[in-house]
């Protein structure tokens, strides 16, 4: 399978062409992170209908996307994780997606 890589000073961001096709949940979550810089499991369920956001985040991390996990509690004490895109990645990820789409 064809792949695309973008080298940066510290990391290589790489993806197989099929792994980030438009319309996949992985791509939808990545674009959500690019637009809003964060996502929670509840958001992913409500917006994209997926209950496995942690698995998609793990896959994105394995491609070199730097995502941090911020553990939080709501007003009722229920714990959840907010996934945050690390600053400075938006341009290189958009470049990768543009190359994949062409």
Task: Label each residue range with its predicted role.
Residues 2-23, 57-102:
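DNA-binding patch around the recognition helix
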Residues 20, 47-48:
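Residue-level marker of alpha-helix boundaries and capping positions
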Residues 24-38:
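Short amphipathic alpha-helical interface segments
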Residues 31, 46, 95:
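Charged/polar, solvent-exposed surface patches and flexible loops
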Residues 32, 48, 80-83:
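Aromatic side chains
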Residues 38-47:
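Short acidic, hydrophobic short linear motifs in intrinsically disordered regions
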Residues 50-55:
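Short, basic interhelical loop/turn and adjoining N-cap
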């Amino acid at each position: 399978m064809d792949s695309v890589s973008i080298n940066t000073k510290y990391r290589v961001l790489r993806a197989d062409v099929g792994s980030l096709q438009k319309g996949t949940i992985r791509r939808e979550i990545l674009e959500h992170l690019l637009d809003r810089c964060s996502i929670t499991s509840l958001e992913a369920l409500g917006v994209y209908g997926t209950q496995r956001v942690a698995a998609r985040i793990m896959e994105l991390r394995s491609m070199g996307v730097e995502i941090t996990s911020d553990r939080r509690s709501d007003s009722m004490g229920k714990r959840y994780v907010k996934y945050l895109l690390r600053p400075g990645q938006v341009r290189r990820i958009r470049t990768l997606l543009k190359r994949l789409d062409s």
